[in-house]
């Protein structure tokens, strides 16, 4: 077997709307292409020996052991690889269960789809599954050592990429509230919400966390001085920089016992408490110097260690932290007790689980020695042996919830302290013998104020009630049940995507909002180009959704991006599907128009239930998407007699209809006439039906998002088929005694649309400079040739600079073949170089002629036209002298009439 390609999906996709995290592996079975598993000697036995846990896979039989039943009876290797890849992740602690295997149009080549939690782990699991299955085919077994290494590697990948318990708690709470989130490039840096409404967090610091507060909290001595000056009980202490000053510092704080810690440490690093001798003090000083140049020496206060969490000025959780320890059973040594406690499945390495495994350091041995034990000692039953001086969870400590026990005065004090330091989220370390009594009564002190406090001890205490502290953070960042969302409008289809996206963005600008939009020619925010290029995939969508100024996102969503990575967002408010026609077939294992429709249906299916899928009622494949989506439906149609739309409106639905020369919004008994088509510049005086359809779709998408009819009309009236607003989309130029038209038509449907306009526009000679992308099927080029023969009087066949793997001249020959099949006496020539072909077409243009250029490079075509000298871009203007009245009905366009279609 051979892996041909591995793709990572991260959003709603062709395989699943709900499951976003999928690996798609294109697998060539090679010699196993026609060999089911039951015909491979020893394969079943070898697979069960390697992965007996596959017994738990139900598969199509729908019962325990169902998958292995299929293997025994005979199934193809791609299917087996799918299940093995899922099981390997499961054995590494990643609970995944979704998979699909489909044979492509190429015999022996399969698409294997597996769910993942971590991208790298998912890709690794796919490759490891192929290795495992191939090994069993070749040798009858997969070595145990290799399997163990695979599982360990997967565990390492999973651990290294995990968000951490605090961030994970925040993410889960966001998901529960329907707040979208995304992980940014830096580890633990996440974005909650989109655009102007988004917030960012790193660990438990927010973008509202003040830098001065963080700096102050990190300088523990400065914090202590400020708090002491405010009457807050803090430990007596001082800061030293040299060992020679240590003895004087000990005397200053009142003698032993003392605490020594780094000035700017965290997570308990370099801290030693309950120091009772000079030797211990020297060792503690050196340990602290490993973390900081400046060392704090403090009086040691006897009591229990508490962490009080304050969010947005309120105490939301309190935990008593217990240092890492073991409890004797009268039989086991200290070392054995540590090993036993570390077997707890809730303990892991670092922060990857709710508790951390206990690891020993210098302090551990000192504590054991002080208690009269070694690692080989057997403590009496019930005896507590402390292994760490500090109670941090990161060093193996545990937590007991005390939220309901803290005294109101201590609550008030904690909240006051956090306000003094200036933090929105803070963790206070308080030492007192009883948190239910005021600190002042028990000589309790506030030891530290911590920025970015961990949430583990609160969300998963070893004893007591788990506290939803992430909920308090969400309440602070998104008060009053805010969702953090902005309107997202996604536009897809075979043709018209860019024009509709630009028009929709332009309409939205009439509302005064900042619109971010992506198209095949670039990414834009407001009136400015952010990045040029074909930006119709998820990465470009993220540029818009991460921008803090964007209030509305209008995203052109192309086939390629959905296939490669899925959508760049979880759900949209509006999903527009313009049409589905033959294009890109045979690419990415999308071989039929029905498959292409299923792919584009992802946009309609990924709309919020309270949003709208805006569908073309005149395209049966698009109209059928209404059955797949849970969203509301809004249809647009060029046919005012559409039976589908009539029934939809009778049921209370909304639609955009081209009727009596008007673009109208219809809902129930009411028709809102927006504008006469000939008054909309984009429609070229009403002579471009496909542009009317685009305008209907954009108007309807805006209407269902509560953009007013007046604002929609203003947008339609001021948007033109110009180089500045729609480059490469029906750009018409006046070159004196002839005209040139530039359009990025590159598939049969778009050729037909251009042809309809050309026939309506001129009766003069029509010259076509035609071609198509090299990765299309042979029959597609032949079809382009046939259509060109029907549209143009003279044809110049050219090829793209990038032939996309096709031999130079091949596409031209196929187009020529199509031309001659339709019109044997057609006038044509082949000039493969696009620049030369365009110049030839312009050179030979007769008076009153029209040169139609369908280029690979729109910018190059426009540049060549402008080099001709005095060139006027002819933009269809609104005819202000025309009274906007329907002569047939005598109704002003701005009025609302009672009409039932």
Swiss-Prot record:
What is the E.C. number?
6.3.2.29, 6.3.2.30
**Disulfide-bond pairs as recorded:** none
Top-rank taxon: Bacteria
Q: Give the enzyme class.
A: ligase
Q: Which GO terms describe its molecular function?
A: ATP binding; cyanophycin synthetase activity (L-arginine-adding); cyanophycin synthetase activity (L-aspartate-adding); metal ion binding
Q: Which Gene3D superfamilies match?
A: ATP-grasp fold, B domain, Mur ligase, C-terminal domain, Mur-like, catalytic domain
Query: Which residues are ATP-binding?
Result: 493-499
Q: Which GO terms describe its biological process?
A: biosynthetic process
Q: Domain ATP-grasp: where?
A: 224-478
Which InterPro entries does this entry report, sorted A to Z?
ATP-grasp (IPR011761), ATP-grasp_RimK-type (IPR013651), Cya_phycin_syn (IPR011810), Cyanophycin_syn_N (IPR044019), Mur-like_cat_sf (IPR036565), Mur_ligase_C (IPR004101), Mur_ligase_C_dom_sf (IPR036615), Mur_ligase_cen (IPR013221)
Instruction: Name the reaction it catalyses.
Output: [L-4-(L-arginin-2-N-yl)aspartate](n) + L-aspartate + ATP = [L-4-(L-arginin-2-N-yl)aspartate](n)-L-aspartate + ADP + phosphate + H(+); [L-4-(L-arginin-2-N-yl)aspartate](n)-L-aspartate + L-arginine + ATP = [L-4-(L-arginin-2-N-yl)aspartate](n+1) + ADP + phosphate + H(+)
Could you list this entry's UniProt keywords, alphabetically sorted. Answer: ATP-binding, Ligase, Nucleotide-binding
What the entry lists under Pfam families is as follows: Cyanophycin_syn, Mur_ligase_C, Mur_ligase_M, RimK
Q: Which family does it belong to?
A: In the C-terminal section; belongs to the MurCDEF family.
PANTHER family in the cross-refs: CYANOPHYCIN SYNTHETASE (PTHR23135:SF18), MUR LIGASE FAMILY MEMBER (PTHR23135)
**What does the protein in this record do?**
Catalyzes the ATP-dependent polymerization of arginine and aspartate to multi-L-arginyl-poly-L-aspartic acid (cyanophycin; a water-insoluble reserve polymer).
Record note on quaternary structure? Homodimer.
What protein name applies here? Cyanophycin synthetase
